[in-house]
């Protein structure tokens, strides 16, 4: 497992590092670009996300057809081009254009689908935890390095670093990552609309949207409020992010262990939302930088509790032959949330105040918490594995209640089922009849 998961996790972590490294300081430095204002800064933060939203599904679907490696390469090359455009930008509109190009390279769903291709569902949580650890490490490094490097070398160095890492990832993809496994599925692909409107997938998609929306709002507002309104030194922003990501990194470990490892994914999702509510409540009433920073720490804990389990949860509700497309939809919702968060956050901050923005976030989070209560607990799903040489009458399972899907890989015959509707002994009896 590690031979494929480690390099892919590095690629995903590097991509997130490239995305996150500009976020802590982008709103501050971009205000100095020609033609910039708070609304356009919000649009700048959201520009990357809107293109990711549009292209996640096409890239996920393309990867189901031509393969994950080729699709990853296309996305990384596009991201590199966008990074160079941003690095050379001298006005807000060129910077927005570069972020739009960066966003076209929508490989998040492809990389996650590729990791799930290499792993059994029962140990997928470990693979996702490894990926989550790389994302968390990339996140933590970017939060600390971003203010330091931008203060010393300027904003453009961050985009050059992003481009360089992406070039290295392409080399790694072809030198280290093993050949992709093939999957033969018994089902026809479900209509695309079902990937959007199936109840549990829809709840996970909306969860992805809200989580990314509140993250965009936080990264837009935190540096502006701390520096412009509460008098915190811009040069010391890295300390805020270092403290917050340290707590967040510990929370990520707990999230992965208790969520997928112990079967408490749904509970962890709910706890994360509760912490979002608490953090924005602290933001709303803060009159000092110290109290505001407490809210930042709480926010990072909630955010990092979610990170190791969200995509793993989404894959459990998707069939194996459409994981790329399903994760594309999931990530598209997330990136729409990032875009909308940047735009609505910039608008409210420009037209009203941060207090109004925080109250808006609290109200939406309460709705989100209630929605998650209706999510089916992912731990009710299990898989049975049989060797390819074992003779089984799998066709009879097509109309059996409780059978989610069955398919063949190059190693096993796999049957996924709902433990609340059917058990292993009954499945084996039916297959041997």
Regions found by a protein language model. Give the residues of each.
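Short amphipathic helix-loop junctions that connect adjacent transmembrane helices
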Residues: 24-38, 220-236
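Residue-level signature of mid-helix packing/kink "hotspots" within the transmembrane helices
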Residues: 49-57, 139-140, 245-253, 338-339
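Conserved MFS/SLC helix-loop-helix module at the cytosolic interface between two early adjacent transmembrane helices
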Residues: 54-90
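Helix-to-loop junctions at the C-terminal end of transmembrane segments
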Residues: 56-67, 251-264, 349
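Cytoplasmic membrane-interface "Motif A"-like loop-to-helix N-cap segments
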Residues: 65-75, 260-273
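Cytoplasmic helix-loop-helix junction between adjacent transmembrane helices
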Residues: 98-135
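C-terminal membrane-cytosol helix-exit motif in multi-pass small-molecule transporters
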Residues: 164-182, 368-376
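Juxtamembrane intracellular "pre-TM" segments in multi-pass secondary transporters
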Residues: 178-207
């Amino acid at each position: 497992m590690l031979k494929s998961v480690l390099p892919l996790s590095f690629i995903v972590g590097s991509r997130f590092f490239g995305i996150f490294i500009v976020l802590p300081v982008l709103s501050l430095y971009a205000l100095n670009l020609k033609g910039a204002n708070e609304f356009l800064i919000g649009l700048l933060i959201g520009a990357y996300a809107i293109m990711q939203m549009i292209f996640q599904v096409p890239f996920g679907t393309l990867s189901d057809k031509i393969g994950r490696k080729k699709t990853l390469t296309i996305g990384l090359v596009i991201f590199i081009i966008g990074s160079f455009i941003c690095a050379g930008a001298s006005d807000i509109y060129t910077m927005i254009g570069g972020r739009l190009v960066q966003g076209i390279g929508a490989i998040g769903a492809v990389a996650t689908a590729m990791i799930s291709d290499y792993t059994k569902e029962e140990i997928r949580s470990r693979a996702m935890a490894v990926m989550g650890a790389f994302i968390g490490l990339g996140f933590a490094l970017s939060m600390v390095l971003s203010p330091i490097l931008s203060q010393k070398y300027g904003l453009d160095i961050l985009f050059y670093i992003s481009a360089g890492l992406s070039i290295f990832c392409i080399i790694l993809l072809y030198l280290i990552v093993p050949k992709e496994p093939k999957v033969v599925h018994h089902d026809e692909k479900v209509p695309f609309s079902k990937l959007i409107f199936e109840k549990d997938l829809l709840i996970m998609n909306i969860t992805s949207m809200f989580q990314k929306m509140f993250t965009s709002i936080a990264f837009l507002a935190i540096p502006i409020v701390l520096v412009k309104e509460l008098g915190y030194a811009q040069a010391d922003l890295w300390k805020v992010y270092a403290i917050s990501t340290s707590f967040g990194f510990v929370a990520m470990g707990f999230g992965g262990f208790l969520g997928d490892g112990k079967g408490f994914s749904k509970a962890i999702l709910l706890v994360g939302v509760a912490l979002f509510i608490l953090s924005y409540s602290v933001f709303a009433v803060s009159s000092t930088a110290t109290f505001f920073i407490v809210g930042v720490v709480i926010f990072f804990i909630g955010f990092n509790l979610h990170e190791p389990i969200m995509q793993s949860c989404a894959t459990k509700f998707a069939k194996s032959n459409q994981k790329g497309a399903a994760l594309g939809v999931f990530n598209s919702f997330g990136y729409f949330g990032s875009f909308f968060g940047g735009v609505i956050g910039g608008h409210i901050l420009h037209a009203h105040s941060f207090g109004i923005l925080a109250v808006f976030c609290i109200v939406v989070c309460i709705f989100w918490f209630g929605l998650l209560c209706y999510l089916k607990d992912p731990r009710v799903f299990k898989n049975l594995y049989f060797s390819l040489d074992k003779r089984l009458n799998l066709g009879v399972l097509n109309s059996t209640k409780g059978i989610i899907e069955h398919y063949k890989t190059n190693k096993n015959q796999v049957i996924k089922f709902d433990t609340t509707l059917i058990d292993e002994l009954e499945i084996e009896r039916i297959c041997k009849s």
